[in-house]
Amino acid sequence: VDYVEAAGQLASDIDGWLSDREGEVLYELAKAVPPGQTIVEIRSWRGESTVWLAMGASAGNGSSVYSLDPQGEQGPGVGDLKETYPAMVKNLSNAGVRDGVTILSSSAEVAALRRRRNVGLLCMGVFQDYDAIRSAFVAWKPHLLAAAVVAVKDCDQPGPSCFVEEYLRQSDDFSIVRTIDTTIIAAYDSCVHYWVIDSVDSGVCQHCGRRRTFRALPRWGKAAGAGK
């Protein structure tokens, strides 16, 4: 049985914006999560990406999948999230993965405070607003384990794109490892960096060889509030 193909067929019946290539990468990332670590997805909408994650987890080490969707919020381009909950439950049940997914109907910030979760994969989706994705990420960053992976979807939109630039690409803590269509994958960097910075504010770590710029970053928040 080609489980990746099976996941794609099941996910294809669900409304969403994920490409097959993005779904396959989420599947492989979920499959690779080590035993004892969890997968957290924030804002799945109707469960398209959740199916990929749950089937990948099942094919791998059986990691628990938590999907956070605050009910009753209005999302630009996605409508009332309260109306998507029944559809999400139905879609996960139809795909045969409902028992492997815990749906948390609360905001990312509230859910992060309720219980410590050892997160090996954090998937950020259906965000258009910079401040919203930043707030959710800041709340869940303390739950990330060493070498955890962060996947940010919809990076063709200003909010997620600017978030990735400021909090992942220009951060000492993360390295961008892959870009697939509109999804950007980053790895939690365990290196204790020792930066040597040149005259044009470009630095290289003497331990791992990573390079980054130390030029002042623009203020993204105000400019990145546009939705889809």
Regions from the PLM with identified roles:
Residues D2-D13, G23-Y194, H207-A224:
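S-adenosylmethionine/decaboxylated-SAM
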Residues L18-E22:
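Phosphate/oxyanion-binding active-site loops and adjacent basic polyanion-contact surfaces
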Residues I197:
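Alpha-helical and His/Cys-centered functional microenvironments
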Residues S202:
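Residues immediately within or flanking Cys/His clusters that coordinate Zn2+
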Residues A226-K228:
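Low-complexity, charge- and small-residue-enriched intrinsically disordered regions
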